[in-house]
UniProtKB/Swiss-Prot annotation:
It comes from Limosilactobacillus reuteri (Lactobacillus reuteri). Keywords: ATP-binding, Cell membrane, Cytoplasm, Helicase, Hydrolase, Membrane, Nucleotide-binding, RNA-binding, Stress response. This is ATP-dependent RNA helicase CshA. It comes from the Bacteria. The keyword Nucleotidyltransferase does not apply. A motif (Q motif) lies at residues 1-29. ATP binds at A45, Q46, T47, G48, T49, G50, K51, T52. Pfam families: DEAD (PF00270), Helicase_C (PF00271). Oligomerizes, may be a member of the RNA degradosome. GO terms for molecular function: ATP binding; ATP hydrolysis activity; RNA helicase activity; RNA strand annealing activity. GO terms for cellular component: cytosol; plasma membrane; ribosome. Belongs to the DEAD box helicase family. CshA subfamily.
Length: 497
């Protein structure tokens, strides 16, 4: 359905077109008319489905720009999601001159107070910082028309339920309430009953919780094996942009440092980093100055970054819902993605729980060998050389090249170049990753699947467009492709219609 059929004004339709939206997504198509009518809505939708515009467009449409009071409040679980939401609403509401502000922890509260004096009509914030401003009387919610709880299940997981309830109680009883959540645990349903008035429900069917656009695999490995296997997979699959999920802050720090030590263009984010440092890392990742982002679940919540082709779950999540959130980082906007989950032998029951929720059976992958990883690096170097020759003018270097050829064998020269462009063998750069406490064993309700292991799997590797940080362009792959697979299903991105 086109946005022009949803009852939005011309100024908003222009903003929508400028933002690159073409047709409304299912969540937008169903939600926007309901919100415009003033109904309460519960939307079960994961990040990447367009839910920010689903609630943002009708909120902007309904804002009275002559009224200086806060008329809509959006509560987000993380700083990153709050910032992204504010930026998107600002872009969409710019033509209408709607003022949108964001408040979050880790930033100078005095600057936020100064910004709040500019009388925003839409306020986005994290629960703790919103509660702080309410206590300081720098935020007043008595004129709120619409309240949005975004990523409600994640706010619940982070322990924000009490803050959320106290914030809701500061708003008028006759407000409109919109609740969005990828999953619907009992506590979220209770919020709907307690604080919403005859809400309409927009629900994604369980089979759609993980999109068909994401090819889902697992590798069975012991904890001490995972890092070497992951780097080999990166060498062979050669992703464009990758997010690696670690269970703890220490894990994220060690993984990012280990990847950097092995020559990968990587950085890690978690809650202990300053907001300024997190913002700089995220800017680099969004602008293709980083190839690999390592993150905890909390730090990565709500990230809306286009072009992520691979998600590596270095640690399997203890909660199946977190898996849904993680792989929602890829397979967006009609593009295919790949998720790969590392599973230790005693974690197979967690894998079965994920499959039960998503109704998708993950395919096993056989870890690549060191030789296959080396061939992957060489193939990537071939691509880099092809691209350099095609794009750069080399005339000024021809004389120097001829002199080198007079004193050196051509094969030796090319071999030296390839040696410089590829990474050292893993054995030459040992990386120690501290073992994490293993997840407790679950009751073996899914024992019928307990014998799954990599002996049934094949090599599902993909060669595609790995951006070295010296230059971020795409290229076609014509060298060194590895296809050994016992499955007819291939990890390559399938042809898009």
């Amino acid at each position: 359905m086109k946005f022009s059929e949803l009852g939005l004004s011309d100024s908003l339709l222009k903003a929508i077109k400028r933002s690159g939206y073409e047709e409304a997504t299912p969540i937008q198509e169903q939600t926007i008319p309901m919100v415009l009518e003033g109904k309460d809505v519960i939307g079960q939708a994961q990040t990447g489905t367009g839910k920010t515009a689903a609630f943002g467009l009708p909120i902007i449409e309904n804002v009275d720009t002559e009224n200086p009071n806060i008329q809509a409040i959006i509560i987000s679980p993380t700083r990153e999601l709050a910032i992204q939401t504010q930026e998107e609403l600002y872009r969409l509401g710019k033509d209408k001159h709607v003022r949108v502000q964001v408040v979050y922890g880790g930033a100078d509260i005095r600057r936020q107070i100064k910004s709040l004096k500019q009388h925003p009509q839409i306020l986005v914030g994290t629960p703790g910082r919103l509660r702080d401003h309410i206590n300081r009387h720098t935020v007043k919610l008595d004129h709120i028309k619409t309240l949005v709880l975004d990523e409600a299940d994640e706010m619940l997981n982070m322990g924000f339920l009490e803050d959320i309830e106290s914030i809701i109680k500061e708003t008028p009883d006759d407000r409109q309430t919109l609740l969005f959540s990828a999953t619907m645990p009992p506590e979220i349903k209770r919020i709907g009953v307690q604080f919403m008035s005859d809400p309409e429900t927009v629900r994604i069917k369980a089979k759609e919780l993980t999109t068909d656009l994401v090819d889902q695999y697992y590798v069975r490995a012991r904890d001490y094996e995972k890092f070497d296997i992951m780097t080999r997979l990166i060498d062979v699959q050669d992703p464009d942009l990758t997010i690696v999920f670690g269970r703890t802050k220490r894990r994220v720090d060690e993984l990012s440092k280990g990847l950097i030590a092995r020559g990968y263009n990587a950085a890690g984010i978690h809650g202990d980093l300053t907001q300024d440092k997190r913002s700089k890392i995220m800017w680099k990742f969004k602008n293709n100055e980083l190839d690999i982002l390592v993150a905890t679940d909390v730090a990565a919540r709500g990230l809306d970054i286009s072009g992520v082709t691979h998600v590596y779950n270095y640690d399997i999540p203890s909660d199946p819902d977190s898996y849904v959130h993680r792989i929602g980082r890829t397979g967006r906007a009609g593009h295919h993605g790949v998720s790969l989950t590392f599973v230790t032998p005693n974690e197979m029951d967690y894998l079965h729980e994920i499959e039960k929720l998503t109704r998708v059976r993950m395919l096993p992958l056989k870890p690549p060998t060191a030789e296959e990883a080396f061939k992957g690096q060489v193939a990537s170097a071939f691509n880099d050389i092809d691209e350099l020759i095609a794009q750069d003018s080399t005339d000024r270097y021809e004389e120097a090249a001829e002199k080198l050829l007079e004193t050196h064998n051509a094969t030796d020269l090319v071999a030296a170049l390839l040696n410089n462009m590829t990474k050292e063998a893993a054995s030459e750069v040992p990386v120690k990753i501290t073992p994490e406490r293993p997840l407790p064993r679950r009751n073996k309700r899914n024992n019928r699947n307990g014998n799954r292991n990599n002996s049934h799997g094949g090599n599902h590797y993909r060669r595609k467009n790995f951006r070295r940080h010296q230059h971020g362009s795409h290229r076609n792959d014509n060298h060194g492709k590895s296809h050994s697979s016992r499955h007819s299903f291939n990890i390559r991105h399938r042809k898009e219609n």
